[in-house]
């Protein structure tokens, strides 16, 4: 089935990487896929050589079109099978009116079980099918040791990779880390952060302000351990090198449709601490943090009609997050055999999301 794939696969964002890997997954499964790029920012990465080749194909005589974009940008073509592909990180999305655009499609694909429930609660009437995201798993073996991380030596290193926005709940992560671990313990918190519209220096300053505010609010000691904060663009090989020197990935977000850095960590062999009752339930392996549905508040995402307090996201328990971080560290320190098994199981689970395996699933969905 010749398939037109519209997505922002050239953007250097999690959404862009998801679109890119889904195209590569379809191609690996033998689908005649024709990619066409749209963009939502000015941060573009080098084009994958396979994508460059696929872009030369004609859109003529396509049998299906996958719209991997915001539902308001969907356009129905009666000559094709029309498939919407979207994500959301909230319990419902009724207030966005996305369901009206989604219901124009023949079917919609989402990456996790939680989103199926959100679709049904939000008035989606067309078939909803799970289409997981994927990775080029070969990138995560024999990782080059090219990152200078002398601070990591002899320590248990927690890793966070994500945007410096409220939805990612970095404030909660800082509260949990500094409440649970004394500065004398050999434990680090490394954060690779970015913030759209801010320079590297401004991003680091914004993080410093947040960190100081958290420490001031905790009032439990006069001196705290410094976090290891890194901002700005890193080449993939440098970021993966940094991540490979860590022992546990942490994502305490209020909502995640997927979380590519978590899956990347698992592919390296690093377990994950993650917010439960989110899209991460579908694939993460490690320690699940209890959460409760709460009205969204102070979201900094770019669309003002999303993440309002008329809908809810999942707020993780800071106490349970701190406890999970302690368990991860103590398991590593006192029961290395158990820790190594958790790592091995995380890495094994990540193999289920290779481009090749997911490509076969997507091909079946296309023909379903």
Which sequence ranges carry the predicted segments?
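Conserved donor-binding/catalytic core segment of Leloir-type glycosyltransferases
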Residues: 4, 150-168, 174-177, 189-191
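A short, well-ordered alpha-helix in the C-terminal region of glycosyltransferases
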Residues: 320, 327, 337-352
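Acidic donor-binding loop of glycosyltransferase active sites
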Residues: 241-257, 267-271
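Nucleotide-activated donor-binding/catalytic signature segment of Leloir-type glycosyltransferases, i.e.
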Residues: 200-240
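N-terminal pre-catalytic "stem/leader" segment of glycosyltransferase-like enzymes
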Residues: 1-64, 188, 356-360
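Short hydrophobic beta-strand element within catalytic cores of glycosyltransferases
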Residues: 271-274, 288
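Extended catalytic core of nucleotide-activated donor transferases of GT-like folds
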Residues: 4-6, 37-122, 238
């Amino acid at each position: 089935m010749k398939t037109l794939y519209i997505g922002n696969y050239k953007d250097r964002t999690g959404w862009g990487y998801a679109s890119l890997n889904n195209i590569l997954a379809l191609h690996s499964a033998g689908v005649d896929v024709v990619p066409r790029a749209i963009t939502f920012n000015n941060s573009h990465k080098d084009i994958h050589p396979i994508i460059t080749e696929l872009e030369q194909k004609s859109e003529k005589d396509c049998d299906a079109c996958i719209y991997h974009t915001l539902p308001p940008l969907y356009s129905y073509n009666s000559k094709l099978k029309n498939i919407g592909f979207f994500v959301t990180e909230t319990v419902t999305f009724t207030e966005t009116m996305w369901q009206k655009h989604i219901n124009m499609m023949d079917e919609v694909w989402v990456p996790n079980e939680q989103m199926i429930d959100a679709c049904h609660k939000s008035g989606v009437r067309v078939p909803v099918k799970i289409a997981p995201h994927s990775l080029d798993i070969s990138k995560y073996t024999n990782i080059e040791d090219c990152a200078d991380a002398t601070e990591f030596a002899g320590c248990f290193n927690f890793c966070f990779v994500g945007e410096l926005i409220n939805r990612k709940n970095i404030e909660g992560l800082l509260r949990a880390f500094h409440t649970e671990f004394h500065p004398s313990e050999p434990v680090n918190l490394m954060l690779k952060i970015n913030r759209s519209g801010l320079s590297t220096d401004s991003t680091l300053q914004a993080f410093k302000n947040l960190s100081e505010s958290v420490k001031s609010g905790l009032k439990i000691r006069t001196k705290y351990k410094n976090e290891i904060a890194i901002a700005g663009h890193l080449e993939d090989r440098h970021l993966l090198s940094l991540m490979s020197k860590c022992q546990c990935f942490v994502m305490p977000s209020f909502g995640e449709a997927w979380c590519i850095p978590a899956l990347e960590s698992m592919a390296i062999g690093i377990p994950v601490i993650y917010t439960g009752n989110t899209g991460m339930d579908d694939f993460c392996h490690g320690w699940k943090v209890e959460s409760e549905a709460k009205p969204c508040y102070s979201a900094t995402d770019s669309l003002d009609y999303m993440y309002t307090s008329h809908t809810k996201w999942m707020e993780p328990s800071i106490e349970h997050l701190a406890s999970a971080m302690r368990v991860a560290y103590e398991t590593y320190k006192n029961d290395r055999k158990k820790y190594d098994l958790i790592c091995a199981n995380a890495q094994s689970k990540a193999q289920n999301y290779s481009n090749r395996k997911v490509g076969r699933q997507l091909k079946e969905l296309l023909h379903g």
